[in-house]
């Protein structure tokens, strides 16, 4: 899912201009999603985007409408390069700084609305137990880890307390070691463990296109698998 751009000045022709009509049209969707659990994954490109502050405001609005939000942020993409000790320390510092910035933006409430300066509770914690990746092809992966366990009860307790749960792609081992994790894997395990109703991933990736270069607006799981197979076959030709 790509980041939204600033809204156009003129509303679409089919958008109701009467506030009452607009509310009547949106009320069924608000009612349908109230109380649902949604995991929102923020890839590195999303958090660095100029429009990110508007994304946070949209998430705050979703929360105010009764959606239980778990926000996972990726502090940096994991590449194939071996992580050095200096790079690991820098990665941890970046992750903690990014978490602080996201908490700061949520603390603003919803600007230009009755919820401006309203207190939105954001909860972070040691929700993820991790284990080391270990040695691959004779190379020690140092601070890279894998998800071992998710504290589902702790996250549910935060959500039931009307908090937004903010999860950094870091994990701790029972021995107190700290590991950096694959954010996509964290999103997947969280969504499955919580039985989330939706998983939304926001990034700077443009999406999946068909053979003619047209963007798929909607895909079932089977259609997505077929699209990936077709893409792989085309690359081999």
Segments (PLM) and residue ranges:
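Nucleotide/pyrophosphate-binding catalytic subdomain
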Residues: 1-237
